[in-house]
Design a protein with these regions (language model features):
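Helix-turn-helix
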Residues: 25, 33-71, 75
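Hydrophobic alpha-helical connector segments
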Residues: 71, 85-124, 183
Length: 226
């Protein structure tokens, strides 16, 4: 029998629904602009006009523009992890990471969006933090992902850390490498390959490059098949 993942209607107020829908709408309108514009050139006034809100309403949801990017990245991480977990339930933790990279490729929808997000992140003095995202916001952001509202909010970096720890524990990886070192390698592959693949003259797609870099990493670390 299928498990129902719908939030109980009586447990959700109209105010909560409106808040969640508005926050997601603002974020998605901002990201839509970022596909074509520079981060600095995006006007909060225009974003609010697009979603039919007063300009001041924006600040009820986000303190500044960079918070929208952080929020979107948290949503992207959420969907990537949700898909990776749904596509396989075995004990192979490295395969889970491989699937996460495949999911990331599916989320790369615009070269300019990727460049602007990376640039905005580099300018931040601190690493992006995990943001509070309600179950309603998760559902409204990804209405085609049943049950995603039940997925815990976790950054991809933390997901990698947990998966590598489990991979060492279950014997997929030898314990001689530090978990943090492997996570740094994964983050380097994630961002570096994303940028390098744009200049690849062989016309190979991003998924190929990610698969290749992960294969090289796992081989170098001494991956063992379960």
């Amino acid at each position: 029998m299928a498990v129902k993942t719908e939030l109980p209607i009586l447990d959700v107020t109209l105010r909560a629904k409106k808040h969640a829908r508005t926050k997601v709408a603002l974020a998605m309108a901002f990201i839509e602009k970022l596909k074509d514009l520079r981060f600095e050139d995006i006007s909060i006034r225009e974003i609010c006009r697009d979603v039919e809100l007063s300009e001041g309403t924006f600040f009820n949801y986000f303190d500044e523009k960079i918070d929208v990017v952080n929020y979107y990245l948290n949503l992207v991480d959420l969907k990537i992890i949700w898909k990776a977990r749904r596509k396989g339930q075995g004990g192979d933790r490295l395969a889970l990471i491989d699937r996460a990279f495949t999911g990331l490729v599916e989320m790369v929808i615009s070269p300019n969006l990727v460049s602007e997000i990376i640039t905005a992140m580099v300018r931040q003095k601190e690493s992006p933090q995990k943001m509070a995202i309600s179950p309603l916001e998760k559902r409204y952001a990804f209405e085609d992902c049943p049950g995603i509202e039940n997925e815990p909010t976790i950054r991809l970096e933390d997901f990698f850390h947990t998966a590598i720890e489990a991979a060492v524990k279950n014997g997929e990886l030898p314990g001689r490498q530090g978990v943090e070192d492997v996570v740094v390698s994964l983050k380097t592959i994630l961002v570096g390959t994303l940028l390098a693949a744009r200049r690849d003259k062989t016309n190979r797609d991003l998924n190929y490059h990610y698969r290749r870099q992960l294969e090289l990493l796992w081989k170098g670390l001494g991956r063992k098949e379960l």
